[in-house]
Amino acid sequence: MVIDIARLDGNTQSFVFGTVARAIYDLKLDGDRNDIPDKIILFVDELNKYASSDAPKSSPILKQLLDIAERGRSLGIILFSVEQFRSAIHDRVKGNCATQAYGRTNAIEVSKPDYRYIPKVYQNMMTRLSPGEYIISNPALRSLVNVKFPRPAYKQFPNG
């Protein structure tokens, strides 16, 4: 199921997102039902809206996201999120992220402490990546990997 909240106003987006996240978490915690999938992917675009590094600790949505980031994997909940500025995300959410994909960003962003462990050559690459090109980081990989997704078939030919 996909729930697109892009056309809703900010408060309604927060309400819908928080309600859906809580419902998924509660369903997985209950665990008595056989009709619930083993894995549920919660995809969040612009994660800083809900798990900002400066969000108040009392934020119910932040608490839910921290629960999902910290305990969700053991329940079969996978948090997949996209954010242009990694430094804007809450530290505990970032700390529980295994795989990270870095797209093009600016020099100001890569100069922040979040990027200190990334070699300078990759930081420089991040400021010049093309659309569809990413740098992948995962603990299972010995070094960062540069990945380039091909253009869609309909865009590969000049007349087609």
Located regions from the model:
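P-loop NTPase motor domains
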Residues: 1-67, 74, 134-140
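Short, solvent-exposed amphipathic alpha-helical segments in soluble enzyme
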Residues: 17-21, 117-118, 152-153
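Charge-patterned, long linear interaction tracts outside catalytic cores
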Residues: 150-160
